Amino acid sequence: MPTDFLFTSESVTEGHPDKIADQISDGVLDAIIAKDPQARVAVETLVKTGLAIVAGEVTTNCYVDIPKLVRSTICRIGYTDSSMGYDGNTCGVMVAIEGQSQDIARGVDNKKDQGAGDQGMMFGFACDETPELMPAPIHYAHAITRRLADVRRKQHPWIRPDGKSQVTVEYRDGRPARIDAVVVSTQHSDEVSNKKIQEAIREDVIANALPKKLIDNKTKFFINPTGRLVAGGPMGDSGLTGRKIIVDTYGGMGRHGGGAFSGKDPSKVDRSAAYMGRHIAKTVVAAGLARRCEVQVSYAIGVAEPVSVMVETFGTATVPEERIALAVRKTFGLRPREITEYLNLLRPIYQKTAAYGHFGRTEKEFTWERVEEKKDALRDAAKSATPSGGRRLKAV
């Protein structure tokens, strides 16, 4: 990778159609797991004008009023009137849910050692570009969309729930130097003028979301570049669970295994192992073992022990990379049950993750972001690790 380059990441607001779907799916998960922590949940949602469809597989001993939950989620997001093109009070709700396949359950529901809920590879990433140890482009893109939602609720009611941001950061010598371009698109009511939209987004959103030191007279701003965005939300585009996996993670800076998070209980390693990968990578960086770290973990369905573990530090490690990989295996348990217990994942914490990113957050529910407990232990383990044969460890 070159040391001087431009890198772009995007974010979307909670009112984006795909994020409505994610929040509904995670709302269903939370409602079930609050009553039955051992439930198996895999729920997908589709939203379109006047309609929400919830489908998937659930095995539980509890009852959840899914249509009521769907409506309350849509209304909380801000779609409460037909003038917005979508109304949680009146939209139709369809539910198509069956039990989990017994073939899958045999491998996962093992009382002695819970197997992975599916095969696959998951990635975790961290870098020292921001205090949250997240890449700068996605960090600032999320800052804009969170601020956009806040301004909508508190200051400018003509802003509608659907919105997007995009931030391009210029890197020099591999470090963020300035913001080169900012794109913001927001749904709005029909009567507001383009001039008012431009002023409000520039002064009340962007100016309060981005560091002034990264903005200069060459920074380019594109605010509602198509001119008008009245027909937004599910009226403008259909929304599906799991279509914003790059927004959910690292904005493209770190790799992604392809598995979405929302609507899945922690037995699905698509979610739990990705959270653990982030936790490990962040701990590596916080411990001063590297400035950038990516962790890959892979699993076979029904098997508890990971098939492989890989640690990559992109030439930024302060100790040999093989030692870091050995220290990771010594310090962290990577079996699904170990991950679930260590990160305390059997709680109704997931709807909050379904907008503005699963990583780089400071709320108490995001246990995978806490690194103080294992930081020193990992550093000590890396210093004392004894590599075998002097070769670089890629899989263990």
UniProtKB/Swiss-Prot annotation:
Alphabetized InterPro entries for the sequence: ADOMET_SYNTHASE_CS, S-AdoMet_synt_C, S-AdoMet_synt_central, S-AdoMet_synt_N, S-AdoMet_synthetase, S-AdoMet_synthetase_sfam
Cellular compartments annotated: Cytoplasm
One Pfam family hit: S-AdoMet_synt_C
Record: residues binding L-methionine: E57, Q100, D237, K268
Cofactor binding description: Binds 2 divalent ions per subunit. Binds 1 potassium ion per subunit.
One GO molecular-function entry: magnesium ion binding
Residues given in the record as Mg(2+) binding sites: D18
Pathway(s) per entry: Amino-acid biosynthesis; S-adenosyl-L-methionine biosynthesis; S-adenosyl-L-methionine from L-methionine: step 1/1
Keywords assigned: ATP-binding, Cytoplasm, Magnesium, Metal-binding, Nucleotide-binding, One-carbon metabolism, Potassium, Transferase
Stretch list, region Flexible loop: 100-110
Binding site for K(+): E44
Swiss-Prot/TrEMBL cofactor(s): Mg(2+); K(+)
Enzyme nomenclature, EC number: 2.5.1.6
PROSITE patterns: ADOMET_SYNTHASE_1, ADOMET_SYNTHASE_2
Catalytic activity: L-methionine + ATP + H2O = S-adenosyl-L-methionine + phosphate + diphosphate
Quaternary structure annotation from Swiss-Prot or TrEMBL: Homotetramer; dimer of dimers.
Membership in a protein family: Belongs to the AdoMet synthase family.
Protein name (record): S-adenosylmethionine synthase
Organism of provenance: Myxococcus xanthus
